[in-house]
């Protein structure tokens, strides 16, 4: 069996998203990492196929109905700047 995990990064900050993608690709080279700028882009894809979701704090606040049932798969990215909008 050749399982290839898929990881979603949902982050409006392109630089943050690309940096995290680069780190994850080095740590988990067998994984497929996909980036989305907003929640709607994720929903247009196949949202339930991901092994993990890396999301901004703002996206978690706005769409916690989706992420709360998937809390074991969800990693919230937080910084001092993220807290300004909450």
PLM regions: where:
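N-terminal/domain-start segments enriched in small and hydrophobic, helix-friendly residues
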Residues: 1-9, 42-45
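A short, well-structured beta->alpha microelement
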Residues: 26-65
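Conserved acidic segment of CheY-like receiver
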Residues: 5-14, 20
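Conserved small/polar residues in nucleotide/adenosyl-binding loops
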Residues: 84-86
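Glycosyltransferases and closely related glycan-assembly transferases
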Residues: 64-72
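Short acidic, S/G/P-rich loop/turn micro-motifs used as interaction or catalytic elements
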Residues: 14-16, 58-62, 81-82
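A short, hydrophobic beta-strand element within the central beta-sheet of small alpha/beta folds
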Residues: 54-55, 71-82
